[in-house]
């Protein structure tokens, strides 16, 4: 009976021995020596035939004793941390590896096989040869990643190449590597290096086979405006990351925050949408600093970005709502009673904007935004705000003119005022999209900097507003010789000589066709002074010091007033109002309140009166475009300082201000001829070789009387010589 019991248990023990993995905690007992085995061998009647030592399990690694069993069952044997771990697999022992040195080359049953090579490919009759094989072939050309080595494998493994459809299986596979992250099989070492690098660029540095407790997060934590966010290691490369974060767009995020803060003073709560969340930094700033005044929705189509947005919400102790279900981190959220909830969605931006209505929509796609304008104006609420950030500056700044014609349907060339031209192109596209939805727009401000073009408009519902908006889209006549420009006159009649509209006389003095037609462009004002002053107040209230100089420049530019004549801090004028200790100048046409103090909308008569008032005050709008003082400097003359020249233009009776589009640009209602004449009047001739080297010319500020030039000097300045 005992022999029968042993025979019944023996197959079970064999099966357990085949799946047993040698680990540091439970090492397999080494096989007894040949002499000892013969002495203790049972009788032939009761003993089965002597079996070979069980081969090591090829699917598990002994170096992961602390990893869960599920992780161990999936990790391939070719992935090891040390060479000793690989040798343990080969010799099947944890202790003295030299115990296998007693192998006899004459005993064919004790031939050692490589755990990563088939038997027909490699056979070792000595432990030394097996060690050299493991070290020189498998370990030497392995790929290292986070302390682990992906050794080359020659086994007949199943080729795995994950795709959207599923796993692709091929019939032939030679030497290959097993990816530690996605278990894909890669044949070449260089391809394996590139494969792992792509995982790192996407932020997929955690192995699927390592538990979350042992894996270290490779995401970097950044802080901007008291908001913490996690970003991927390659967050600054938009082509290779799922969640792009650009630190250079900080001004863009701050000015949009001031816009939303100014709108939140009109009505509460606001339903806001960040259609392209990426890391969610913008929506997090809205919810964290404005609290219950806003209901923020952050959307992104990428699954990894949505996961990262949820992590950033928990990092900033904000409640996350996904599919009408509230997800909380657990601890730390009880103190956030003033912070608003954030709804995170994963769908196409066009679909989301068609399904829901919002008071504030921000569009910041990668490139042009024309594909999302129709859906943005489809359901935006009346008197809501739509902000559009365009980063396709190569087409807007006339470097790729065919792309601008394709996306915006306009003809442009490179001019001295190309940044304002880009802003007017985007506003025209926004206005046309709003008009298709029977809505008009009021431009609150437009900003064009080095990296982006930002346009913010207020939506006015109704076909009347749409018609008024459509009338403000006109063509521009641009002179290619002197760069004078003017918008075409209203009307559909064809003029016999359109060159007469230009103030310059280049067509009569120069041969050929001298002017081109640009556009269609937005021809009305680009700034709302009252709204900009409220934005300045919000920036001071929230402590955004970086954006205040830009907003002040926009205010001066909207009023077309030099900064020396208009100060936002000096309460010297009775027409100025105080906002939190900051005095800002107010005019009759700047304060436009659509909502009463109780947050309710005023009557339609009030809105009609406001529209009439805007129409009567149209003459106070700032002049379009600007001149670059360096571009029109006179040869052989030293031009005056910029501040002094602004005062000279103002004293001559022209409206003048600086512009944010160009640091050396001057916005004025003077024509180019008048601009050059005043520049010539206050310029001084350059000192030539007759002056000694040590003599320093007098500074321009000390010059009180303008320099009178003779007729010959004027002729030389204009480029002509009088004989």
Swiss-Prot record:
It catalyses: guanosine(27) in tRNA(Tyr) + 2 S-adenosyl-L-methionine = N(2)-dimethylguanosine(27) in tRNA(Tyr) + 2 S-adenosyl-L-homocysteine + 2 H(+). S-adenosyl-L-methionine binds at residues 253, 300, 348-349. Residues 1-10 have a biased composition (Acidic residues). A zinc finger (C2H2-type) spans 177-199. Keywords: Isopeptide bond, Metal-binding, Methyltransferase, Nucleus, Phosphoprotein, RNA-binding, S-adenosyl-L-methionine, Transferase, tRNA processing, tRNA-binding, Ubl conjugation, Zinc, Zinc-finger. Residues 220-679 form the Trm1 methyltransferase domain. Its EC number is 2.1.1.-. Specifically dimethylates a single guanine residue at position 27 of tRNA(Tyr) using S-adenosyl-L-methionine as donor of the methyl groups. Dimethylation at position 27 of tRNA(Tyr) is required for efficient translation of tyrosine codons. Also required to maintain 3-(3-amino-3-carboxypropyl)uridine (acp3U) in the D-loop of several cytoplasmic tRNAs. This is tRNA (guanine(27)-N(2))-dimethyltransferase. It comes from Rattus norvegicus.
């Amino acid at each position: 009976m005992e022999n029968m019991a042993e025979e019944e248990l023996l197959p079970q023990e064999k099966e357990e021995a085949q799946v047993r993995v040698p680990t540091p905690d439970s090492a397999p007992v080494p096989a007894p020596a040949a002499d000892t085995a013969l002495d203790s061998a049972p009788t032939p009647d009761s003993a089965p035939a002597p079996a070979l030592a069980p081969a090591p399990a090829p699917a598990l690694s002994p170096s992961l004793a602390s990893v869960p069993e599920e992780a161990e069952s999936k990790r391939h044997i070719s992935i090891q941390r040390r060479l000793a771990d690989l040798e343990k697999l080969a010799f099947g022992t944890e202790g003295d590896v030299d115990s296998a040195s007693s192998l006899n080359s004459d005993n064919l049953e004790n031939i050692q096989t490589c755990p990563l090579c088939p038997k027909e490919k490699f056979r070792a009759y000595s432990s030394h040869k097996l060690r050299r094989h493991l070290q020189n072939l498998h370990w030497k050309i392995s790929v290292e990643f986070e302390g682990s080595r992906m050794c080359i494998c020659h086994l007949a493994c199943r080729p795995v190449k994950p795709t959207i459809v599923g796993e692709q299986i091929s019939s032939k596979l030679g030497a290959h590597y097993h990816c530690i992250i996605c278990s894909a099989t890669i044949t070449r070492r260089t391809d394996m290096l590139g494969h792992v690098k792509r995982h790192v660029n996407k932020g997929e540095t955690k192995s699927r086979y390592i538990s979350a407790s042992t894996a270290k997060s490779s995401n970097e934590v950044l802080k901007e405006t008291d908001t913490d966010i996690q970003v991927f290691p390659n967050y600054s490369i938009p082509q290779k990351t799922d969640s792009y974060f650009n630190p250079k767009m900080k001004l863009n995020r701050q000015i949009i925050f001031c816009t939303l803060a100014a709108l939140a003073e009109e009505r509460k709560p606001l339903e806001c949408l960040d259609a392209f969340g990426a890391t969610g930094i913008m929506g997090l700033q809205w919810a964290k600093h404005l609290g219950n005044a806003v209901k923020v929705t952050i959307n992104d189509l990428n699954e990894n970005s949505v996961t990262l947005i949820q992590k950033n919400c928990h990092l900033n102790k904000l409640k996350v709502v996904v599919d009408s279900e509230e997800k909380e981190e657990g601890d730390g959220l009880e103190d956030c009673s003033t912070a608003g909830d954030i709804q995170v969605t994963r769908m196409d931006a066009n679909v989301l904007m068609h399904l829901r209505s919002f008071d504030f929509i921000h569009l910041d796609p990668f490139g042009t935004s024309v594909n999302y304008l129709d859906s943005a104006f489809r359901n935006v609420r009346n008197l809501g705000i739509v902000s559009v950030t365009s980063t396709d500056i190569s087409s807007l700044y006339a470097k790729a003119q065919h792309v601008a014609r394709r996306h915006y349907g306009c003809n442009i060339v490179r001019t001295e005022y190309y940044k304002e031209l880009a802003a007017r192109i985007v506003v025209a596209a926004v206005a046309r999209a709003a008009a298709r939805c029977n809505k008009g727009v009021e431009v609150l401000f437009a900003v064009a900097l080095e990296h982006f073009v930002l346009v913010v408009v207020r939506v006015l519902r109704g076909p009347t507003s749409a018609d008024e908006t459509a009338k403000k889209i006109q063509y521009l006549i641009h002179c290619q010789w002197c760069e004078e420009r003017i918008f075409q006159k209203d009307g559909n009649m064809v003029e016999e000589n359109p060159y007469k509209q230009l103030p310059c006389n280049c067509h009569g003095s120069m041969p050929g066709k001298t002017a081109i037609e640009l556009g269609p462009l937005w021809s009305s004002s680009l700034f709302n002074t009252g709204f900009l002053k409220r934005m300045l107040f919000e920036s001071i209230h929230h402590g955004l010091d970086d954006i205040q100089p830009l907003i002040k420049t926009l205010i001066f530019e909207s009023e077309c007033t030099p900064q020396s004549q208009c100060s936002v801090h000096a309460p010297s004028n009775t027409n100025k109002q105080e906002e939190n200790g900051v005095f800002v100048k107010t005019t009759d046409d700047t304060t436009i309140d659509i909502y009463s103090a109780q947050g309710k909308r005023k009557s339609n008569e009030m809105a009609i009166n406001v529209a009439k008032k805007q129409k009567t005050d149209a003459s106070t709008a700032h002049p379009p475009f600007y001149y670059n003082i360096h571009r029109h400097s006179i040869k052989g003359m030293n031009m005056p300082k910029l501040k002094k020249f602004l005062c000279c233009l103002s004293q001559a009776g022209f409206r003048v201000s600086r512009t944010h589009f160009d640091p050396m640009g001057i916005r004025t209602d003077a024509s180019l001829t008048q601009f050059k004449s005043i520049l010539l009047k206050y310029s001084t001739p350059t000192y030539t070789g007759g002056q000694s080297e040590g003599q320093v010319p007098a500074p321009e500020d000390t010059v009180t009387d303008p320099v009178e030039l003779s007729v010959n000097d004027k002729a030389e300045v204009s480029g002509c010589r009088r004989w």
